């Protein structure tokens, strides 16, 4: 089902039922409003809903039942796993891998090459419930990695190449090249075997 003025690039594979351009609150009841913009070679699997005013680059892929809210911008060669939720007003870079059942809240910034494991929860409200102007999602800098089922508190910055161990609860910034582990997480030096320096996206 399509709403709004959508623009989908060449060679897109869209497996119904998919909803493109669903109206945000300000456009409910309107028939004339912006849709989504999706680049070439996209694969969008059944059950997914992408709201209006979302911009997605080339070679995007998503699993089933993915929700992407309004005014989110996603770069090239990025994938989002099954049943993940990306709330509005967020930015996601190139070559990002978001695994299944991840929650990305409003006002989150995810840079190029980031990897987010399954079941990760990012948060944006330190003392809920807070009004929208106060919501501040995490900032995940280039090539940072988050292990499965970790929780990242509002406004936390993961530096370039930083890593978060599975199941950790991150309550303070993680410097570039460091690892956070535990609940609450403590910052340590990166193990010698380390994660990768960059993510090599498939052609």
Language-model features: where?
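A glycine/serine/threonine-rich, flexible loop-to-helix segment
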Residues: 191-202
